[in-house]
């Protein structure tokens, strides 16, 4: 009976665990939908800023913003690493950290040192374990990231590039593909290339360049501000995609945990039933044996 009592305890324990993972799955599903909405809402802003900046760059070809000038001579490279603050989201963080480590080795092979910015506690811990130089970080963004919280950490990287201290700035995050698929990506954030400003309309034509703005105070000041806002929007978009990926990965991970818990419960229930059947059979045998002896 002690064995049966122990099995009942295990079944109860796994059932309680399954209740927790099921609840976490439902919470993650709800947060995932909101994260996807934020991700989609961020895209039009970045697209519009890009279109305006592209038009102004074409209208004022004599001016080149520092973000569009190459710093090949710099001995360092910057990277903004976007991860989650929490775990229990499958291999999502592991994948983007592995990709980042490969990028670090590639840059170090080119003789570059790393100037890193961490967004998320998992990435910050990873960089600290590597003893990498962390020039800025922001953690505990919560479920609703605000651009104001990101600007300070991102500005450090933008200033490093503007001052010619880094040859390029890379952005590492997890791109949201769909609910079941998220992929780690590392994109070059700076210098900005002309290709980034080329966006085709739905009919395949490029946006019209026949009109112009009235600039206040002047075109250069507006371009300077626009390009900073554009880069900030790209980082915010990456953070929004990373959060949508996090909730999707967590929902899938918790569903898998719930399914596995159900399988374990069924197996334990089968063992319990067999033990109970064996105990009953033994008692019956003892009763029959006692009756025969009398």
Swiss-Prot record:
Q: Which GO terms describe its molecular function?
A: ATP binding; proton-transporting ATP synthase activity, rotational mechanism
Q: Which UniProt keywords apply?
A: ATP synthesis, Cell inner membrane, Cell membrane, CF(1), Hydrogen ion transport, Ion transport, Membrane, Transport
Task: Tell me one GO biological process term.
Answer: proton motive force-driven plasma membrane ATP synthesis
Q: Which InterPro entries match?
A: ATP_synth_F1_ATPase_gsu, ATP_synth_F1_gsu, ATP_synth_F1_gsu_CS
Compartment list:
Cell inner membrane
Q: How does it sit in the membrane?
A: Peripheral membrane protein
* Entry-linked PROSITE patterns: ATPASE_GAMMA (PS00153)
Q: Name one GO cellular component term.
A: proton-transporting ATP synthase complex
Q: Which domain of life is it from?
A: Bacteria
Give the main localization category. membrane
Report the family membership. Answer: Belongs to the ATPase gamma chain family.
What function does the entry list?
Produces ATP from ADP in the presence of a proton gradient across the membrane. The gamma chain is believed to be important in regulating ATPase activity and the flow of protons through the CF(0) complex.
The protein in question is named ATP synthase gamma chain
**Gene from which the chain derives:** atpG
């Amino acid at each position: 009976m002690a064995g049966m009592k122990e099995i009942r305890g295990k079944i109860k324990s796994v059932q309680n665990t399954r209740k927790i993972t099921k609840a976490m799955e439902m919470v993650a599903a709800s947060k995932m939908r909101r994260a996807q909405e934020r991700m989609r809402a961020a895209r039009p802003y970045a697209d519009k800023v890009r279109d305006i900046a592209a038009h102004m760059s074409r209208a004022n070809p004599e001016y080149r913003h520092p973000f569009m000038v190459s710093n090949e001579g710099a001995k360092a490279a910057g990277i903004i690493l976007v991860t989650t603050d929490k775990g229990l989201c499958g291999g999502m963080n592991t994948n983007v950290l592995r990709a980042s480590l490969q990028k670090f080795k590639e840059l170090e092979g080119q003789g570059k040192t790393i100037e890193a910015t961490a967004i998320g506690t998992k990435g910050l811990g990873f960089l600290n374990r590597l003893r990498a130089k962390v020039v800025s970080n922001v953690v505990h963004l919560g479920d609703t990231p605000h651009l104001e919280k990101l600007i300070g950490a991102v500005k450090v990287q933008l200033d490093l590039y503007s001052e010619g201290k880094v040859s390029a700035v890379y952005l590492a995050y997890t791109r949201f593909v769909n609910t079941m698929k998220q992929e780690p990506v590392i994109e070059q954030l700076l210098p900005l290339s002309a290709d980034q400003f080329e966006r085709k309309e739905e009919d395949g034509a490029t946006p019209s360049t026949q009109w112009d703005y009235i600039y206040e105070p002047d075109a250069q000041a507006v371009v300077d501000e626009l390009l900073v806002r554009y880069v900030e929007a790209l980082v915010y978009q990456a953070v929004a995609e990373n959060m949508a990926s996090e909730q999707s990965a967590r929902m899938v991970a918790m569903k898998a945990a719930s399914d596995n818990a159900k399988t374990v419960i069924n197996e334990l229930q089968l063992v319990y039933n067999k033990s109970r059947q064996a105990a009953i059979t033994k008692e019956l045998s003892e009763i029959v044996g006692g009756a025969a002896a009398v």
